[in-house]
């Protein structure tokens, strides 16, 4: 009995120690803060001007290391960046892409891109193996980043996030914004407040003044991070506005159906009450 009690106390102390350790880890590893996004909530939509600025940041900064596996013509999306057909044609033609089929001599060759082509990988890293050999690990595909980097907000926030008129799902955008603004230790370009362990392989990619916005928006890190996070959210989920419209229609249908069933029940059973 004494041994059993001793073992129980030892286990309890160990569990308490682990709880304290985890609490300390959580305290040292803050979660990204919830940001305000035009596309969050039941009625959220993408801000076209913001997506165009975000694409500019991707093109001038992020594309040096990260691929973006979407076709050029996706940029014509009226619910997305909304570029014109001519703009997309000119953009695609400015890239050299590898042709799917060899020429008459059996040689693989490159040609100017067309709107139907996907964005090519960075010139320095034509494939994941080359990127991994140079960097130690292949940088993630930016078309998947916002979805892949979603995180749990914990209790009680996940309850509020699930409310019908909130439906907050933009944790991936929050994460991207947090990482880009988390390089807060002077003199250490690989220390990030929000990255697990605070050591990140990617040196700080962007600072104030790195990109001159075409629309005159202030060239500040906060704007860069917010705009590219919005663009990458669209790249990960371009059908978001349409999905939200469908969800709203379903909710309205269910409310009307519930009302009809309620009044039908009252009419059918009125003589028995």
Language-model features: where?
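Sec/Tat signal peptide C-region and signal peptidase I cleavage site
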Residues: 18-23
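Juxtamembrane interface at the cytosolic side of transmembrane helices
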Residues: 243-248, 252-273
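Bacterial N-terminal signal peptides that target proteins for export
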Residues: 1-10
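Acidic, glycine-rich loop-and-strand cores that form catalytic or ligand-binding grooves
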Residues: 137-188
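C-type cytochrome heme c attachment motif
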Residues: 56-67, 117-125, 138-147, 178, ...
